[in-house]
Amino acid sequence: MELRDKVGQLPFSPGVYLYKDSGGKVIYVGKAKSLRNRVRSYFSEDKLGDIKTGTLITEACDIDYILVDNEKEALALENNLIKQYKPRFNILLRDDKTYPYVKVTNEKYPRVYVTRRLRKDGAQYFGPFFPANLAHRLVHFIHRHFQVPSCKVDLTRFHPKPCLQFHIHRCLGPCVQGLTTDEAYAAAVRDVRLFLDGRHSDLARGLRARMEAASLEMRFEEAAGLRDLITTVEEIEERQKMAAAKGDDVDIFAVYAEPPLVALNIFHLRNGQIVDRRELFWEDQFEYDESLFLSSLLKQIYLDQQFVPAEIHVPVEFEDLEALEELLTEKRQRRVEIRTPQRGQKKALLGLVETNAKHSFDARFRVLKPSSRAIQEALQDALNLPDAPSRIECFDISHIQGTDKVASMVVWEDGKMKKSDYRKFIIRTVVGNDDFASMREVVTRRYSRLQEEKQPMPGLVLIDGGLGQLHAAAEALEAIGIADQPLASIAKREEIIYVFGQEDEPVVLDRFSPILHLVQSIRDEAHRFAVTFHRSLRNTRQLTSELDAIRGVGAKTVQKLLKEFGSLERVRAATETQLATVVGRAAAKRVIAHYTTVEAAPEPVASVAQSEDAAPDVPDPQA
């Protein structure tokens, strides 16, 4: 049966429809008050003229549907099916930022800890929390007052003695037989769940009953501890009431779009204060409709998230707004309103978020060329430097298992790389694989020379590496009497920037931050330059050592071959005619004879430090 014929047989009831391709894969999920009317609209001339709808109908070979009682049920089912199938024609939430939850595990002795990954493992997840450190503060409070741990000790068996957490009263000690009972531990976990769920009155009531029972049984120390905990819980409840009176929890959404490119900003207000901001981006919204876009996103965000704010502010209304409000109200068990503010402070806040969405779009999608001074000031602010750095010198070490050790220094100055100032170093004093010692040597040589020549220091010295390399560079500068030199390192993979003197507060920039991209690009250029020099040095050593073993081939001939062919492999692959054009027919015959009649001799270890002695800091010949 043709797809158009199937449409005529759809009911007029509310439900969810699923378009499928020729392989039976779900490519689009939608909902409707009337299935037949909604699906039939896809075949109108106006709709088929859209790129997205036209492509969808071209690829769709079949349609399934599920009937529900009302639009609210259709909305919830649509969201679940989108999560399950991830259809490529639906607008999918791609969040680059994850927020922490507090997890209560599903174990005999549940543990409590912070996680950013939600799993279907039977555990309870509370959150997400804004700002992120709130989750860690809550878990610390739970350890201190409820003594439910987050440790990774195997709790499926007993251990001979408890860990430090038990002795400092942060754990009930379920890992050691006799320290607690199953009932006492289960009661503590119930208290934790009530606390995290915000049911402070219920928690205080239960604690008070246990306090009175302990007092009657003359367990006075336990009763005193419960009394103190009741006081703490009631104080928290009172603070929350006062905060709620000052301002509600609100999420504010704004979008800036130049289809197919879209930037979304979400501001999170908690107790009337802005506590966090999220940025999301799309590059595939060719048929962008702001109402449909926001409707789809709000369902994906809030139907899958435990916390729902009292108000959600959006720039435009959308079709299923009331149904979504009802669902979220049921989920929150308190009234949830989705509004489009028209005046006053709420309208002004929405305008602020819209401005930020436009800036996010520009930063992500436009080719911006800020002034050199603006870049320097942004870098100064991000790394908390004393001055805006107009010149950055970046170092990297390269070797293979401690052999052919070299270093590079590249220079960024006034907004661009300055290749004429690049330097490369052959490591002289370090034996074996010791990157820290190599970094000390190179930094010492570079800045001792600047001191001798009375040259100014750069605005920032950047090291490719982690804390070890950073401290090695700092030790080298201190040893030659250079103090207060701005110094930082960027660790590979984690992309965390450490600033010397501020190591306890590493700089973690957004992965789309232009400052992070700048630091990464300088670091990557230093790495490229070091690896290129290392490879060249290794090839030179291999080529020289092997060709020197050929009878009748002198040093000048070797240098000609090296200059022309660059590597041993290319010399081996060259024909006699190709070799003869470089070194003459007689030498070419000797090279060919060597490779056709004699096995290559083992490579002797050759010293290459002499070239470095002549020129300690060698400018890049390609610059």
From Swiss-Prot:
GO molecular function: DNA binding; excinuclease ABC activity
Subcellular location: Cytoplasm
Alphabetic keyword roster: Cytoplasm, DNA damage, DNA excision, DNA repair, Excision nuclease, SOS response
InterPro entries: GIY-YIG_endonuc, GIY-YIG_endonuc_sf, GIY-YIG_UvrC_Cho, RuvA_2-like, UVR_dom, UVR_dom_sf, UvrABC_protein_C, UvrC
SMART domains per UniProt: GIYc
Domain GIY-YIG, residue spans: 12-91
Gene Ontology CC annotations of this record: cytoplasm; excinuclease repair complex
All residue ranges annotated as the UVR domain in the record: 201-236
Any GO BP annotation: SOS response
Residue ranges of the region described as Disordered: 604-623
Pfam families for the chain: GIY-YIG, HHH_5, UVR, UvrC_RNaseH, UvrC_RNaseH_dom
Database matches in PANTHER family: UVRABC SYSTEM PROTEIN C, UVRC/OXIDOREDUCTASE
HAMAP family cross-referenced by the UniProt entry: UvrC
Subunit text: Interacts with UvrB in an incision complex.
Job description of the protein: The UvrABC repair system catalyzes the recognition and processing of DNA lesions. UvrC both incises the 5' and 3' sides of the lesion. The N-terminal half is responsible for the 3' incision and the C-terminal half is responsible for the 5' incision.
Family according to the record: Belongs to the UvrC family.
Name of the protein in its database record: UvrABC system protein C
Organism listed in the record: Solibacter usitatus (strain Ellin6076)
